[in-house]
Amino acid sequence: MAPRVAPGGSQQFLGKQGLKAKNPVSTPNSHFRSASNPRKRREPPTIDTGYPDRSDTNSPTDHALHDENETNINVVVRVRGRTDQEVRDNSSLAVSTSGAMGAELAIQSDPSSMLVTKTYAFDKVFGPEADQLMLFENSVAPMLEQVLNGYNCTIFAYGQTGTGKTYTMSGDLSDSDGILSEGAGLIPRALYQLFSSLDNSNQEYAVKCSYYELYNEEIRDLLVSEELRKPARVFEDTSRRGNVVITGIEESYIKNAGDGLRLLREGSHRRQVAATKCNDLSSRSHSIFTITLHRKVSSGMTDETNSLTINNNSDDLLRASKLHMVDLAGSENIGRSGAENKRARETGMINQSLLTLGRVINALVEKAHHIPYRESKLTRLLQDSLGGKTKTSMIVTVSSTNTNLEETISTLEYAARAKSIRNKPQNNQLVFRKVLIKDLVLDIERLKNDLNATRKKNGVYLAESTYKELMDRVQNKDLLCQEQARKLEVLDLNVKSSREQLQYVSKSNQEHKKEVEALQLQLVNSSTELESVKSENEKLKNELVLEIEKRKKYETNEAKITTVATDLSQYYRESKEYIASLYEKLDRTERNNKENENNFWNLKFNLLTMLRSFHGSFTDETNGYFTLLNDFNASMEELLNTHSNQLLISMTKITEHFQSLDEALQSARSSCAVPNSSLDLIVSELKDSKNSLLDALEHSLQDISMSSQKLGNGISSELIELQKDMKESYRQLVQELRSLYNLQHTHEESQKELMYGVRNDIDALVKTCTTSLNDADIILSDYISDQKSKFESKQQDLIANIGKIVSNFLQEQNESLYTKADILHSHLNDTNSNIRKANEIMNNRSEEFLRNAASQAEIVGANKERIQKTVENGSQLLDSKSKAIHSNSRSMYDHCLALAESQKQGVNLEVQTLDRLLQKVKEHSEDNTKEKHQQLLDLLESLVGNNDNLIDSIKTPHTELQKITDHVLKGTTSLANHTNELLGLGDESLCNLETTIEDTSLVKLETTGDTPSKRELPATPSWTRDSSLIKETTNLNLDSDKKFVRETYTSSNQTNEPDVYDKPSNSSRTSLLRSSRSAYSKMKR
């Protein structure tokens, strides 16, 4: 903040120990003024105090590039302890600090709140334990050093109402013999520290103070009584943008800190305070206490602003600096503070100004283009302190209790944002002593006059209302004079601009006069030329009648030429359309060929994939078949071994029984006369032997039967399943090959039909184009030859009558006509040749494509037949072999069963015979012992013989089973060999087919470079019949003759040739005829 305050008038003198001041003498109840020198406030001389050159619309982005001299606002937080009322209410603490002085504070909400613990960091944080002295030494003392060095500094207190802002800034204002009390605030301590430093420096100085408040957006001086107070106004300093000047504020010089403390006490008593629910002594206004210091500069010092060194002859140089101590009114909630009526209005104005201050802080932090300084007088006064050239310190006071948590967080958030504001402090410029002395002398003289007039009572006494009215009139007249002066300046500028316009108009008039004289001379020359043109017109008038008759004939010829040219243009357009359709057909054919080629390669890839897949599946099936045969051979060998072992066991048991029988017979031979009991014993032993033999044979035959049945059933089911799988694989292969062949055949047929169609369309198109071009060429040649003779005969007459101008005109038209005819004929010839070339190339390509397609179809057909035969042969061979294996297995099984049954029956017969014999022996043993003994011996011999036969019969099935097994093994070996042959044939066929497919490819056309590329044909020449020079013979008058002569003269002087593709003139038609004639003669040759 940097307001320049106009002095209110006081006497000062400059001494060695400083500038001393006498208090002005004033009468509180009357206003006595000298008539010769009435007292009035005088604007001080402009003193450069280093305030920034800023406007309200300046953006902080001008300082985006941070200079090394830029500094952030110093933010200090002071936490107030709990009051007696809060202690009685048992309010909990929400703010915690790290001792008396730190750098952080934490916000801890109660458990019922949604807030969480949050930590804020600032330059310094003072807890409730910190006293006024600690706060002063760590926050204000460094700023005083900067003030002594020539910088402007601002310290302002910001916070909620009732948090101790006024106590921090002012505190206890009492003193005893120059000693401050313990509760003295920052302002009293700053005054004492300042004068202590000045007295110790032994330099001349002058200190003055001002104290005013901002109450309801109105500035009020606190150093004068309410009766003497005049309305203060804030103006922009025109000499320095960004500074403000406050008029109507009293500035008092002080010689020591006691004087300043006395002024502070008087102003504090006049300040607006009131009691609210939140604070018993709540400040209702913002107060600003300003200390202005003028200090003599010592020799040898360097002026940073003017970049010069102070020498010993610098007694007349002073440096000015200011310290602003701002006590802001606290923000408050109307509902909590209980403000009503007047207090509610005060609260609204306070909150509005603080809200504007917050918006200014946000705009500065966000580097906005517009800073709203003008929205409040508070922000206008603090303009230089926020983002300007002043060093600023912000003391934030907050409450530590949980009841004010919301306001505390809001205050800390604003303080945290304010830390980001950057100021660029600058040392104030030096001023000369005489500027300050002059101001002081005038004030002394004015005060002397006022004092003498008061003592002598030589003046005018006025009532207070009259005096105020008089002063208001004087001020209004001063303002009116200023306005009139501004209007005079504007009028002077208008007069100056009017003079300049008058000079410009006079110069323009002179130039216009010269132009008029030149035009008059040109008019005389034009009149002379007009007379000569009239005489020439009379000469041409007689020749015009003859020319019109000849032009009628020329018009007739032109109409015929136009008809022929129109026909040629129509033929040319049709040819272009035919050629465009031909190119389009070629493009479609090319696209179809590319698509067919892609289809062919896809078909080839799919066919190879399926063949390789079939080859893999066929190999897997064959390997499974071989595995099955090996398992079958192993099963047969195992069966043979099992049956052989069982027969050997049976033979061993039978041999053992018969050995026991032989032993019994031997015992029978030794004692023929055995008793019946012995015979019964023999009979019982024979029965036991018989029964055990029958049981062994029965178990053996059952095992053989069951094993043979299981083996036969397994082999049959596996063979049947293998046969089904092989048949299914062959069937799928045949279907896939047949579908691929059909797809290939369909593709080839469609390609043939497409190529035949393309060829037929191209032939028809070429024939049509050729016929049209030949007809057009014949018609054009006949017409050109016919018109040439007529045109040449008439040209001589026309040239003889109309002269050189008409001869040149006709010659240009003739050349243009022949030129266009040559161009048209060349286009027709090029088109015809391109059509022929394209037809030949397309015929060659289509024939070659058809040949390739036919050969490809033959190769695929042959491959199809060979593969089909191979597959059918393999399938038939597989069926036959499977049937043979099945029949052999079945016959072997049946033969095994038959042998087992026959053996069983033979044993049963032998056993039955033995039973009958034994029964007979038992019946007749008693009667015919001797006779039966011999018969018994015979029977035993026959039994031994039967035993041998039985052993032989048992050996015989074993031999037969061995033979059957050998036969089955031979059959399976033969089947494996045939299967290997079939696999070799299948592999060979599949490899041949795969090789054939891989070797088969599309034959691409060779590029010869003779095919004409597609190009854009020129646009069809168009023209209209030019009849501008053909005049009607009827209603002929002089005006039309003059117009015709002018047009003829203009057309004869034109040198620009017409564009070939623009609307042709008569000369273009002549050139077209010439070109057509030469083309026709070439065709005849």
Curated annotation (Swiss-Prot):
Region annotation Disordered: where it falls in the sequence: 1-70, 1049-1085
Family recorded in the similarity comment: Belongs to the TRAFAC class myosin-kinesin ATPase superfamily. Kinesin family. BimC subfamily.
Keywords, in A-Z order: ATP-binding, Cell cycle, Cell division, Coiled coil, Cytoplasm, Cytoskeleton, Microtubule, Mitosis, Motor protein, Nucleotide-binding, Phosphoprotein, Repeat
Annotated positions binding ATP: 159-166
GO CC list: cytoplasm; kinetochore; meiotic spindle; meiotic spindle pole; microtubule associated complex; microtubule cytoskeleton; mitotic spindle; mitotic spindle midzone
Function (record text): Could be a spindle pole body motor. On transition from G2 to M phase of the cell cycle, the spindle pole body duplicates; the daughter pole bodies seed microtubules which interdigitate to form a short spindle that elongates to span the nucleus at metaphase. Mutations at cut7 block spindle formation.
Domain Kinesin motor: 72-421
CDD domains: KISc_BimC_Eg5
Residue intervals passing through the bilayer: none
Residue(s) carrying Phosphothreonine: 1011
Gene Ontology molecular function terms on file: ATP binding; ATP hydrolysis activity; microtubule binding; microtubule motor activity; minus-end-directed microtubule motor activity; plus-end-directed microtubule motor activity
Species in which this protein is naturally found: Schizosaccharomyces pombe (strain 972 / ATCC 24843) (Fission yeast)
Compartments, as annotated in UniProt: Cytoplasm, Cytoskeleton, Microtubule organizing center, Spindle pole body
Ranges of biased composition (kind: Low complexity): 1065-1078
Protein name per the record: Kinesin-like protein cut7
Coiled coil: 436-604, 715-740, 897-955
SMART domains: KISc (SM00129)
Sequence repeats: 987-998, 999-1010
Polar residues biased stretches: 24-37
Listed InterPro entries: KIF11-like, KIF11-like_kin_motor_dom, Kinesin_motor_CS, Kinesin_motor_dom, Kinesin_motor_dom_sf, P-loop_NTPase
GO BP annotations, alphabetical order: cell division; initial mitotic spindle pole body separation; meiotic spindle assembly; microtubule plus-end directed mitotic chromosome migration; mitotic spindle assembly; mitotic spindle elongation (spindle phase three); mitotic spindle formation (spindle phase one); mitotic spindle midzone assembly
